[in-house]
Structures are given as C-alpha cells and as structure tokens.
Amino acid sequence: MSIVATKLRNGSGAKGTQEGRDVAIDIRQTTLFPLSKVTNTSRNTYAPPWEWVAASVWTPRMLAALETNGVRGGKWHSLIDKVYTLPNLDAAWAEVKANKGAAGVDHQTIEHYERDLEANLSKLAAQLQDGNYVPQAVKRVWIPKPGSREDRPLGIPTVRDRVAQTALRNVIEPIFEVGFAAHSYGFRPGRGGQDALRRVEQLLDAGDTFVVDADLKSYFDTIPHAALRERVATKIADGRVLALLDAFLHQEVMSTVDTTTPEAGTPQGAVISPLLSNIYLDPLDQLMAARGREMVRYADDFVILCRSQVEAEQAMSEVQDWTTKAGLRLHPEKTRVVDLTQKGGFDFLGYHFERGSKWPRKKSEQKMKDRVRAITKRTSGQSLSAIITQLKPILQGWYEYFKHSNRGTWRPLDQWVRQRLRSILRKRCHRKGRGRGADYQRWPNAYFEAQGLFSFVAAAARNGQPSKR
C-alpha cells in the first residue's frame, strides 16, 4: 500500500510549497513510528475526539461552545459547580483508584478511603462547594534515579487531594486542550511519544537536518506561579476555580526533615501538573508555529528541525528570548544546534538520531541493562526458569518502545543477556570463568529459546525487520 504524507508549513492542503520547494514525505522509504488514532494525517494537525472528556461534566452543549469558542469574552464562567458534583468526583475517584499509588501524609490508603467512599466523596463535595477545602501537605520521599547513583524527589498527595485534583482537571482540561498546538504531544489525550517520534522522523526525511536540541533546566520546578495563573485566567474567569488552583500551587511539601511551601513550580505528584506545564509552554508553541518553525515538543523535551544553520540559530535565539521573558532557563551546556549532515546527532524521547539512523540512546540502554543485572546476579538462588520469567516483561516492554530502532541494535543485546545467564549457569556448575566456547556448546542459543527467553532478534523478525549479522 502506498502512502504519501505531505509536510506543509501552512497546513492548507495535500500539497504545498515551502521556501519555493515542494515538500513531500514518502512513507514507503522510511520506518515510521505508528500514528495514534486521533492524529489527523491529512492535515498533520490534532483533531480531538471528545470521548475522553468526563461525560459527568461536559454536556453536548458545552462541547459545542468549546469547539466554536462560543462563550462570553472567550472565558469560561461558573465552573466550580462542575468540579464538586458527585458524578464528577465519582469519575475522579475511579481514575485515582485505577492509578493506585501510596498513602500521603494522612497515612490513608486507597483501600481505606474506599471503605467509606460515599461519605468521603460527600464530605469533599461539601468542602469544595462551601469553599472550606484546604489541600493537605504533599509527602516527599526520595527514590533512586534510574541510571544514576543520585536520588530524586517524589511527591505523594493524599488520596483525597488526588481526587480533588482529578475533578478539577476533568473540568478545565478540555478548555485548554482544544487550543493546544499540533506539535505538542506530551500529557495529552490520545497522543504520545510515538507520535512525536514519528513527526521527527518525517521532518528529518524531508530534509530538516539542522536541529535545535533544547533543554529546559528544572522546568517543572521553576514555573512562576503568578505567570502561570495569568495564563490560566486567559480562559477561566471563575474566581473560585482560580483560588482552588492557587491552593494546589502553594501546597506545602513535607519531608522527614521539614515542611516547605514552594514559591515556584507545579505541585509535586499532582494529577494536574502535566496540564499546567502544557498551559505554560503553549505560548512558545504558538510562537514557533506562527514563525513557521517545525517544533516537536513532548512536555519539557523539544526539538526544532530546520533547513539551514541560519534558520536553526534564529530559532534558538527566539526560544532563548521567550524563555528568559517567561522566567525559565535553557541549560547552556545542553542546548545546541546539531548539523545532521556532519558527524553527531541528538537524543529525543529515549532515541538517538544520527545521519538517517536511530537507535536507543546510551542512557536508555543502560537503564534496561541495570534492571537486567539486578535479576541476573551470579549469586542468584532462583531457578533459571524463574529468572527468565522475570526478564520477559522487562525485555519485551523495552523492545516495544524501541522496536523502530535500526536492525543492528538487537543481536548484541541478545548476546549480552544470554551471556549473563551463562555466567550464572557456569558458576552453579563450578566452572572457571574461561573457555566461553565451551559455554556456548553446553548452553547454545537454542537452549535459552527452549526455556522461553525473550529474544530481541526474534521479536524484530516477527515485526518484519530482518536481523543484521
């Protein structure tokens, strides 16, 4: 089947001219990432299907007003009553329960909250309606940072606060979602990393080989509260909804040492934080779109793909100016212009792109190997069958995300995993750590295949990608 997708700066139709040149992408010549079901391939824009909205909040009449901007002054009034309705709180609770999560500072687990669910939701509804709701402190814990010896902070709101945040998000997310730029892919209904990666590959194949590789420094922790609130207020005029948002922004953070009140940033661990982060960066998205820049953004990770060094430097200058005015910072050592016609490349969403090729970046591979190492220690007392069972979801899940990598990626990884297992078997047989040829003869690849070990090469073959020896 022949598919040709046309890349346009103006998005006006099936074929267009950019800088005096016809630009088209023949998907037959590339291995593209799959496109989500909600991305409109004919216009390369985002057409939101409203199945994801909370039906308990958004009536057909409200959705019609949303699509036509048919509200007074372009702002939405009287929304707080939509937040505290029991159907909305019940829908929010269902999502919180499905997402699981630990107890917050009140030590109340999801199971405990559910034991008296009707009373808990009724009490929360009354507090939100009366204006007496005050979020509790966020519990801060430190967890290992993957691929690093450092720890990173994790915020855990109480179950009650997670329900309230989800209820608020159910109300305000569609108001902003309808206007978000097409090139924003992170934390949006029906969109994901695969869509963003696919767009990057399309642009590279079309000749946009000068890349602004941008890195926002500590973005989620540095968003100015006042400026964020102003952006939310451009579409929401309900003072009580804005006050509820303020309460979450100034939510205390409690650690084992002290309690602090954040002066900037989105709430740690909050359900609403991803939406707020997109709201704050949307003006940058709109600026890049207005100036014809091919930007692809996933949360705070974004690249701008250009046709020339001059265009890329101009785009980077525009981003630097905007971030400075917005109270944000670009990492000076990690923000750069990359010329893909020369040696070198860039990383985006776990992949490394370089001169027409792509493969898992080193850090992505290292994280996977660290997880494998933890299971395949030579001192492990588990049976080989038990070890292979534990490895399967790790290897299979990693492959599913990176399966669009170059075919030469897989064989070395298979060899590495099998060698880890051979080392375990060799130790159990009290064989010295030499004579690996004998190990291969005693435990050939077919032996591990019979044991059910997941194989990257075999998975790639099933996916229609021949192995590269």
Regions found by a protein language model. Name each.
Residues H112-P135, W398:
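Amphipathic alpha-helical blocks
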Residues Q127-W142, P146-E150, V171, G179-G345:
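Conserved polymerase palm-domain catalytic core
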Residues R420, L425, C429-R469:
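Extended C-terminal regions of large enzymes
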Residues M1-E118:
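Non-catalytic, polymerase-adjacent accessory regions of viral genome-replication enzymes
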Residues T335-K343, Q390-I394, P412-R418, R434-Q441:
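A glycine-rich phosphate-binding loop feature that marks nucleotide/adenosyl-phosphate handling sites
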Residues V159-A167, E201, R229:
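Duplex nucleic acid-engaging cores and interfaces of nucleic-acid transaction enzymes
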Residues I387-C429:
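Non-catalytic, peripheral interaction segments enriched in hydrophobic/basic residues
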Residues H250, D321, A326-G397:
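A conserved non-catalytic segment of reverse transcriptases
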